[in-house]
């Protein structure tokens, strides 16, 4: 998938901050990018990770557009004020985390926005890393209008009764029977949330309910191995898994 742009091929995109409806009818900010041209284009909702609605989220939004997707990354941290992403996400953590209900409604707003665009091809996927990976799976089990979902090392899919909180009242694994689309999972074997054992439990639930899924697990990789600004970055594993993400979305959304 990399370096497949022909040298005489036109490429252009529009990337900007927009306003869209979210949880409780709130107007929230979102970062959106779309290919230039008439389309039609498939859509992707990128759910922010725990570090916040940050520069990396914007970069990944544009990366998907470079590959032909209209992409929206909603600011699920909007209710905690404005400032540097890390400061705002810290406020969310102090408050017990962004409630699942709020995130799902923000994702629904982003999906509805994508489907309303005149250049949409009618298909959309969701993806998230870290807590966003958990939310991507939860969205695929809870919302309509999702044709493919990618969970990148999402911790908290498997939860004990003691792990449940008012913000996270249900373990996503308990909703596996409601998964409505194909699922791709990307995991590092050296991480503790999720642990390889928790990934095993997730996979067992998917098999039990006969779901369409593919999990890829990488040795010598832990949490956030895509993040090139961290010591956790693993170039070979990151590149291989990005190829799998583009192949997965391409087969299911570019129809």
PLM feature spans:
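N-terminal cap/leader regions of alpha/beta-hydrolase-fold enzymes
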Residues: 1-255
């Amino acid at each position: 998938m990399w370096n497949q742009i022909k040298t005489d091929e036109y490429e252009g995109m529009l990337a900007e901050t927009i306003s869209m409806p979210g949880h409780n009818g709130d107007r929230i900010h979102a970062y959106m990018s779309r290919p230039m041209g008439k389309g039609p284009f498939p859509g992707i909702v990128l759910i922010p990770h725990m570090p916040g609605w940050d520069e990396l989220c914007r970069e990944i939004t544009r990366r998907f557009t470079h590959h032909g997707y209209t992409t929206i990354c909603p600011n699920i941290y909007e209710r905690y004020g404005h400032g540097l992403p890390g400061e705002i996400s810290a406020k969310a953590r102090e408050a017990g985390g962004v409630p699942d209900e709020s995130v799902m409604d923000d994702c629904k707003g982003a999906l509805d926005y994508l489907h309303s665009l005149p250049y949409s091809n009618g298909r959309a996927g969701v993806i998230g890393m870290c807590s966003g990976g958990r939310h991507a799976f939860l969205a695929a089990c809870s919302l309509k209008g999702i044709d493919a979902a990618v969970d990148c090392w999402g911790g908290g899919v498997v939860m004990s009764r003691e792990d449940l909180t008012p913000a996270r009242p249900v373990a996503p694994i308990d909703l596996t029977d409601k998964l409505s689309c194909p699922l791709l999972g990307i995991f590092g074997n050296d991480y503790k949330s999720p642990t390889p054992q928790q990934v095993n439990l997730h996979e067992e639930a998917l098999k039990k309910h006969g779901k369409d899924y593919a999990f890829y697990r990488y040795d010598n990789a832990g949490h956030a191995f895509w993040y090139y600004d961290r010591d956790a970055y693993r170039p070979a594993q990151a590149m291989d898994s990005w190829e799998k993400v583009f192949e997965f979305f391409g087969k299911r959304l570019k129809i």
